[in-house]
A protein has these predicted regions:
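A glycine- and small-residue-enriched flexible loop/hinge signal that marks low-structured segments
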Residues: 1-183
Length: 183
């Protein structure tokens, strides 16, 4: 039930609603009700373009959105990490599908906890390797197709300013989460 998930005996330390950035505030509220016992993995919109301007406008809620979602991010929490961009992977039948950043990060967090302690950042080429996606990018809003991108250093720098964690490709390492910021 809605109340049962808030009980102390429910043991979890990570929460996410993959593909639903509009539920970030609900996850923050749930975590607050549980005395901040979890890390909230937040998604950016699947259609958010990979430019510094688009990412910063969304993260700063430049469109004055009233709630989290396609138009902007309104929530913040010391327990919230927001990640960008989305990923490309395959489903069980081998077809390519687009997945939100939280899909990649939940696995990366679990892998990190297997090789290090949970308080170590799941970031960088040692503990931040993303092994459940083949590319990163976004869905082009005009064509409806996945657009593969490389999150360049300048875009990563602008993401850092607004506390959005970049997932990018590095030669010799593959796809890597390269951030450990909370919003």
């Amino acid at each position: 039930t809605n109340q049962a998930i808030r009980e102390d005996q429910r043991g979890f330390n990570v929460i996410a609603t993959p593909g639903y950035p509009e539920l970030i505030s609900n996850m923050i509220n749930l975590n607050t009700d549980r005395n901040n016992t979890a890390f909230v993995v937040g998604d950016t919109p699947l259609r958010l373009e990979g430019t510094s301007t688009a990412i910063q406008n969304w993260a700063n809620n430049s469109s004055s959105a009233l709630d989290n979602g396609e138009d902007g991010l309104v929530s913040s929490s010391d327990y919230l990490g927001v990640f960008y961009p989305s990923g490309l992977t395959t489903d069980n039948s081998g077809k390519s599908i687009v997945v939100p950043a939280s899909h990649m990060m939940m696995r990366t967090l679990a892998n990190n906890d297997n090789i290090a302690f949970p308080w170590f950042a799941p970031s960088g080429t040692r503990r931040g390797i993303v092994d459940n996606a083949t590319a990163v990018g976004y869905i082009d809003s005009k064509e409806g197709e996945f657009e593969t991108i490389s999150v360049t250093e300048s875009v990563r720098d602008s993401m850092h300013e607004v506390k959005i964690n970049p997932i990018t490709f590095f030669s010799g390492a593959g796809i890597v989460n390269f951030g450990n910021l909370t919003k």
